[in-house]
């Protein structure tokens, strides 16, 4: 059976929960493109079954930050997904601050191992 991976392209294109904006870029647009690219890469491997939170760049989930997140989690849980990957592009005005973040629900799990190898 294929591993089910739910990719959440964080934030909405308008309305609630739109994310950061700067230098002509909108976080939700970058997240959408990265999510589609990642989904395409994973779909090329038959070991993975992939779903996205937003199937179009104009899709809006929820009516507030809380309901937007709840909608994404509900979609993943109702599938049910084995892994939930939420893509975000954080920023800071200080160019010396950079890096990536990975959060997992529990240590000593397959998800924890995967997070350490991303």
Protein language model features and the residues they cover:
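Catalytic-core regions of hydrolytic enzymes
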Residues: 2-113
């Amino acid at each position: 059976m294929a591993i089910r991976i739910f990719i959440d392209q964080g934030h909405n294109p308008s309305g609630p929960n739109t994310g950061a904006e700067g230098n002509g870029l909108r976080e939700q647009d970058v997240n959408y493109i990265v999510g589609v690219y990642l989904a395409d890469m994973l779909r090329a491997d038959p070991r993975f079954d992939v779903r996205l939170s937003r199937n179009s760049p104009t899709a809006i989930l929820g009516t507030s930050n809380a309901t937007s997140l709840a909608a994404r989690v509900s979609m993943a849980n109702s599938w049910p997904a084995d892994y939930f990957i939420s893509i975000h592009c954080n920023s800071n005005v200080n160019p010396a601050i950079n890096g990536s973040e990975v959060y997992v629900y529990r240590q000593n799990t397959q998800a924890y191992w995967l997070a350490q190898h991303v």
